[in-house]
Amino acid sequence: MHPQGRAAPPQLLLGLFLVLLLLLQLSAPISASENPKVKQKALIRQREVVDLYNGMCLQGPAGVPGRDGSPGANGIPGTPGIPGRDGFKGEKGECLRESFEESWTPNYKQCSWSSLNYGIDLGKIAECTFTKMRSNSALRVLFSGSLRLKCRNACCQRWYFTFNGAECSGPLPIEAIIYLDQGSPELNSTINIHRTSSVEGLCEGIGAGLVDVAIWVGTCSDYPKGDASTGWNSVSRIIIEELPK
C-alpha cells in the first residue's frame, strides 16, 4: 500500500482551475456565424482574465522551520502572594547566658622572712595584708617554711591560715599537721628534725578589700601539744593570689 501524498492547499487548486479555464477559452474556435459583438465581448473577457491572473504565482511547498528567537525581556514583577500558614511550634531551646566581664588582671602578693626562727607552740606566726579586688573571686594561699615538732610522749601540732582573724569556711579550713608518737622504748623520741613544709589551699566567700592573711600554730583536737618551731634557719614566705571563679 503506497502512502498517500499531502493534499494540495485550496489556493493552489483554485489557481490551477482558473488557468485551465483560461486555456480552454483561448483554444476554443470561434464560429464565423457568431455575432461580432459577442466575439468582441469574449476577447474583452479574455483580456480581463489575463490581466487579473497575469503574474499570479502558485504556492510552493512549506519552508524549513525557522530558528528559535532571542529570549524576551523580563516581565514585570508579580504581585506578592498571600501569607503562608504558621509553622509547627519548635522544641524548647536551652537558655544561654553570656557574661561580658572585663579582662582578668593578675593580682598576687608575696611576703617573705629570711629567718623567722619562731619557737612558739600556740599563736600567730606571721601575717601578710592583701588587697582583694573582687567579691566573687577566690584566694589561693601558700605558706612555705621549715616546721619542727618534738616531744617525749605522743603529741600533735597544727599550722593553719586565718583571713581577717577567722579560719576559712569556704569550703573548709586550710591546715597542715605534724603528729609525733613516743615510739618504742629503744628509739629516741626526742629527735630534733626541722623540715621545709608547706600549707596551701583555696578559700572562697571573702569580700573585696583589705584582707589580713596570717599563719598560726595550735594544737590538734584530743592530743597534747609538743615543742613546735617554725622558720628555723631558712627563708619562710606567704604567697597570696586572687583567682577567678
Swiss-Prot record:
Record GO terms (molecular function): frizzled binding; Wnt-protein binding
Domain Collagen-like: 59-92
Post-translational modification: N-glycosylated.
Disulphide-bridged cysteine pairs: none
Gene Ontology biological process terms in this record: cell migration; cochlea morphogenesis; establishment of planar polarity involved in neural tube closure; inner ear receptor cell stereocilium organization; negative regulation of canonical Wnt signaling pathway; ossification involved in bone remodeling; osteoblast differentiation; osteoblast proliferation
Keywords linked to the UniProt accession: Collagen, Extracellular matrix, Glycoprotein, Secreted, Signal
Annotated stretches, region: Disordered: 64-87
Subcellular location: Secreted, Extracellular space, Extracellular matrix
Residues modified by glycosylation: N188
Cellular component aspect of the GO annotation: collagen trimer; extracellular matrix; extracellular space; sarcoplasm
Source organism, top-level taxon: Eukaryota
Signal peptide positions (record): 1-32
Coiled-coil annotated spans: none
UniProt function note: May act as a negative regulator of collagen matrix deposition.
Protein name (Swiss-Prot/TrEMBL): Collagen triple helix repeat-containing protein 1
Species, as recorded: Mus musculus
